[in-house]
Amino acid sequence: MSGWPRIYYKLLNLPLSILVKSKSIPAEPAQELGLDTSRPIMYVLPYNSKADLLTLRAQCLAHDLPDPLEPLEIDGALLPRYVFIHGGPRVFTYYTPKEESVKLFHDYLDLHRGNPALDVQMVPVSVMFGRAPGREKGEVNPPLRMLNGVQKFFAISWLGRDSFVRFSPSVSLRRMADEHGTDKIIAQKLARVARMHFARQRLAAVGPRLPARQDLFNKLLASKAIARAVEDEARSKKISHEKAQQNAIALMEEIAANFSYEMIRLTDRILGFTWNRLYQGINVHNAERVRQLAHDGHEIVYVPCHRSHMDYLLLSYVLYHQGLVPPHIAAGINLNFWPAGPIFRRLGAFFIRRTFKGNKLYSTVFREYLGELFSRGYSVEYFVEGGRSRTGRLLDPKTGTLSMTIQAMLRGGTRPITLVPIYIGYEHVMEVGTYAKELRGATKEKESLPQMLRGLSKLRNLGQGYVNFGEPMPLMTYLNQHVPEWRESIDPIEAIRPAWLTPTVNSIAADLMVRINNAGAANAMNLCCTALLASRQRSLTREQLTEQLDCYLDLMRNVPYSTDSTVPAASAGELIDHALQMNKFEAEKDTIGDIIILPREQAVLMTYYRNNIAHMLIMPSLMAAIITQHRRISRDALQQHVEALYPMLKAELFLRWEREELASVIDALASEMQRQGLITLQDNELHINPAHSRTLQLLAAGARETLQRYAITFWLLSANPSINRSTLEKESRTVAQRLSVLHGINAPEFFDKAVFSSLVLTLRDEGYISDTGDAEPAETMKIYQMLADLITSDVRLTIESATQGE
């Protein structure tokens, strides 16, 4: 490049370097998209904009990608490294004419015809300044937004720091030439496909236009379902039709979001400033699969686990910075207080009551509103657990909103709905102290401005945050496989509840919970908490803690829980150093070395973080517990023990394996434990290795409290086979509370009502107990004897004496 173009670009780059601060999506394009910089690369942009080209150039140079302004020389031919699909307002006449893109594509393809070794990588790139979707009134949504010079100047001046450069996966021109030819018609098709690609990408980043709120309400009021519900309201409450309609409008006002792009931009600035000071990093994994879904036109429903009120903001922030539209979020009505409520509403929150029972008008309005969001193409987010987990484990799913999602499909919408499970993890949850109090019986404090300010005042170093996108679940595919006749239930007016709906929703919900756990994230805090809580005195020397973390890390890396789970790349020593900076542990020095201590007052709180990854370590912990107690055990006997206890573990922790997969899982874990030197294998028997017995015992402790809890329930069931389910739950909790006091068990979930309720339901499903309360004494006693061998004698005596004393 020489002469006037060089001078022009240098002059144009001066204001851009000041006004524009763009972000690359993905963060590492060459690595994440598999670009080979040793092979020729050319860039395709949607429309002629030198500002876009220079913004792209800055990102290319920052990520060691070829400079788009440097032409490509191929077989003596000199070609521009960039192609504009659309023409546009130009300053100099020699710039790309309208059909130049087709000519350049043809030139590139023609070079491949004469050179079989040539393979140019064509990389589509979108550069966006601002992402306001606009309102529905007036103009139609343009497929591509071309701005003239004046408009572009103002866009860059106002939105230059809210810009991103989106790199798409490359297209091999060699493959295009081999499979489709190199003539001009193929070049025209390539330009047309690129144009469609950019239009879809813009829609994925900006979203559909927003309706005027009153227009949305008018449309909802005109729906037959709400009109019928209004008539029923007037008749049942003996009020006028106008009054019933006002009630419906009041409910819409209570529920509906009031999305504002300017509020999103402002909040993004505030959160960007806040995150950088509170978090040491936010780790995002598998976002590309969601970007692809959005690009392919899917209606996306984000289904994250719920750890903290921070989840709402963190996920929207992450999605925004991944080039996606922040979703409309179903938030509890308890958050609709001033000033949080109006702010959340403008950030996309729509509010939902805890229960719909007894209010047909409310349930109809909410269902129609949710259906309208889907039909308009807005992404939606809701927490299938229904509330924040107080224990750090996933809660049993609440299926109401999920059921309404499937009912929205039964209205005959054309866009495919896909559920995206998301694991959110933290190294510090600001509400964890409150959770512990609530589990001990304290009344939940109502959300309010003073409570919010108190919470914000306590925010300090929050460590790392984790957002892992799990395996998406296309609802249409799921229904086609499991309910082939589902289309017979489509009704565009009525909310249909076919016989298959409830069992299918329950099955989908359980599958979602498994997929959320599949995307679990191990980190310094939850690994250190797991190890220290496994120690009887909540303390280990630094060498012991390092050895234990190495054990956990090797298990998770060499026998991964799932392909979607993540394990830190740092060493055990680096993780310990990071965890100590969080000020949750104490380090004492003696003449021999460092001792890492988990203070008593912190122990209860730290169980929350341990529980975040309990599912990722429960299988090796269970195997270690069985081997430790038996000292030596055959491979077959080990499998029998695991298979007997697995149904309870699977239901409680939403584990991923089916029963027939257990044999291979046990083999893989046993091989890894043997490699680590924790056990030895002799004549198909697994033996403890005395040299590493402490590490094995600490690993086994991860299953200790779970096995004790199961022992309580199975002993009660054995002692009284005719006990009914509610009494079994109640008495199990009573014994668990006594056990926690007498044996210093600091885990609040040890006697959590929900845990025992889930356990008793699983016992019913597995045939240990019937709905009438009749148990099979021989079977329950057999399992109890197995469990009794895996717990200490003093705990066993406490369990048995507690029931005898009654």
From Swiss-Prot:
Single GO MF descriptor: glycerol-3-phosphate O-acyltransferase activity
Keywords of the record: Acyltransferase, Cell inner membrane, Cell membrane, Lipid biosynthesis, Lipid metabolism, Membrane, Phospholipid biosynthesis, Phospholipid metabolism, Transferase
Documented EC number(s): 2.3.1.15
Lipid biosynthesis found in the keyword field: yes
Gene Ontology biological-process entries: CDP-diacylglycerol biosynthetic process; fatty acid metabolic process
Pathway: Phospholipid metabolism; CDP-diacylglycerol biosynthesis; CDP-diacylglycerol from sn-glycerol 3-phosphate: step 1/3
CDD domains in the record: LPLAT_DHAPAT-like
UniProt KW Transferase keyword: yes
Catalytic activity, as annotated: sn-glycerol 3-phosphate + an acyl-CoA = a 1-acyl-sn-glycero-3-phosphate + CoA
Topological relation to the membrane, as annotated: Peripheral membrane protein
Subcellular location: Cell inner membrane
Comment, domains: The HXXXXD motif is essential for acyltransferase activity and may constitute the binding site for the phosphate moiety of the glycerol-3-phosphate.
Name of protein: Glycerol-3-phosphate acyltransferase
Lineage: Bacteria, Pseudomonadati, Pseudomonadota, Gammaproteobacteria, Enterobacterales
